């Protein structure tokens, strides 16, 4: 069994924009995020994009048995209790900074619940752990795709964070 590893942490591989905006923040200093900060409308909810260079070609047509996601989280957001990340297919297989955040959001792949606050956490997806998300991501990557989108459509108060920021 072979292993493929890819990281999304560069200026052309990770970033976010508000759903209704084409102003992108890119690179590992910004990351990919979802939810809203001082965003009282759906257009201000963040869309995060992660591109795993080489994944499309390396995984197309392969039989994927497990996916491990190592996620580094900042201390931003509503706190250290459990949060839910919502993953989507990407409408572009690149970090297309010439479009609004909304243009990147494809069909929903599923959700992942964990302690995503000021830490690095690894979640393993397979047929017995996070099975629904694994099945959707497996099919998506086996079809030759290499980008994932984080988006949950949450809004927040004018002075705070949304629940799953």
Question: Whereabouts are the PLM-identified features?
Answer:
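A mature extracytoplasmic/lumenal domain signature
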Residues: 56, 68, 73, 91, ...
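Proprotein-processing/basic-patch segments
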Residues: 4-6, 44, 135-165
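Beta-strand-rich interaction/scaffold domains
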Residues: 73-146
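A short beta-strand element within beta-rich, extracytoplasmic domains
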Residues: 52, 62-76
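Flexible, small-residue-rich N-terminal segments that precede or flank a structured functional core
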Residues: 1-56, 85, 89-93, 155-159
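Surface-exposed acidic, glycine-flexible loop patches that form ligand/cofactor-binding
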Residues: 56-63, 136-142
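Short, surface-exposed loop/turn motifs at beta-strand boundaries within globular domains
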Residues: 43-47, 62-64, 143
């Amino acid at each position: 069994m072979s292993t493929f590893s890819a990281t999304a942490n560069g200026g052309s591989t990770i970033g976010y924009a508000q759903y209704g905006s084409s102003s992108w923040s890119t690179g590992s200093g910004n990351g990919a995020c979802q939810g809203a900060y001082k965003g009282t409308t759906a257009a201000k909810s963040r869309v995060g994009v992660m591109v795993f260079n080489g994944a499309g070609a390396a995984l197309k047509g392969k039989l994927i048995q497990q996916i491990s996601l190592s996620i580094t989280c900042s201390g931003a957001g509503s706190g250290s209790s459990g949060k839910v990340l919502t993953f989507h297919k990407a409408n572009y297989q690149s970090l297309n900074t010439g479009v609004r955040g909304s243009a990147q959001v494809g069909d929903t792949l599923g959700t992942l619940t964990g302690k995503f606050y000021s830490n690095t956490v690894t979640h393993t997806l397979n047929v017995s752990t996070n099975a629904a998300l694994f099945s959707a991501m497996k099919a998506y990557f086996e079809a030759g795709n290499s980008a994932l989108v984080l988006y949950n459509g949450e809004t927040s108060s004018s002075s705070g964070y949304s629940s799953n920021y």
